[in-house]
Amino acid sequence: MIRLAVIRLAQGASRAQFLQKQAQIFTSAVVNAKKKADNKKKNPPAVFSNLEENAVVQETIKEIQRVEGLLVEELTRHFSLKVDIRQYEDVMVKLENGKDKPLSMIARVTLKSPLMIMINFQDNPSAIKAAKLAIQKSTLNVTPQQEGAVLYVNVPPMSKERREKMASDAKGRILNEYKKAINEIYSKSDKKSSNEFSTRPDEAKKTREALLNMKHAAEQRGGLLIEERRKQLLKQVV
């Protein structure tokens, strides 16, 4: 879902201010998490004052900040004790033509009651079978029931087992998605750097080292934040 959100961001810059605010929230949360982290582990440098003139590095910093903001959004939804229909809207569905689309683009998702999701396929009934399968295979841990062109999903109440499942999903799926998004940014920036500094090997080497350090630092910050949120959730398990 993080990568899906990255694609949506590329389609419009209207969320820039929101993401900047989310990045600030992320930074604050990471500071708290670092205080509790193993002191034997040192964080890679996140600020490169000697590369302020390097356009590739500066653009990469902005891209990483956007993804970090998206991670905060994803974790907020994931660990919320309330039903969030966006978790269902973002489920990717593989259609008969082989294309993957989020559920929100092929059906109307609404909250019928506090613990029931209604997914209406009236305008796209041929997609209901694929959507049902996608929901069943997702990490939502629910079983949709079909009535005509509508799927109904009973959301299970919060329990010890469900909290533990949410914590496990965060450490696995969400962290992997986040790392994949960060790695894509690194790969794109590294390729751009190689082309831009093809005749300046020293600058290319310095840029590559900076990009790699930024990648590792972002991965560590993301891991710290996820671990902090997991611990907070599991504290509520009796």
UniProtKB/Swiss-Prot annotation:
Gene behind the chain: mrrf-1
Spans traversing the lipid bilayer: none
Protein name, UniProt field: Ribosome-recycling factor, mitochondrial
Keyword Transferase: no
Chain's role: Responsible for the release of ribosomes from messenger RNA at the termination of protein biosynthesis. May increase the efficiency of translation by recycling ribosomes from one round of translation to another.
Domain of life where this protein originates: Eukaryota
Main location per the UniProt record: mitochondrion
One GO molecular-function entry: ribosomal large subunit binding
Species assigned in the record: Caenorhabditis elegans
Similarity comment: Belongs to the RRF family.
GO annotations of cellular component type: mitochondrion
A Pfam family matched in the record: RRF
InterPro entries for the chain: Ribosome_recyc_fac, Ribosome_recyc_fac_dom, RRF_sf
GO terms, biological process: translation
Localisation: Mitochondrion
Highest classification ranks of the organism: Eukaryota, Metazoa, Ecdysozoa, Nematoda, Chromadorea
Keyword list, A-Z: Mitochondrion, Protein biosynthesis, Transit peptide
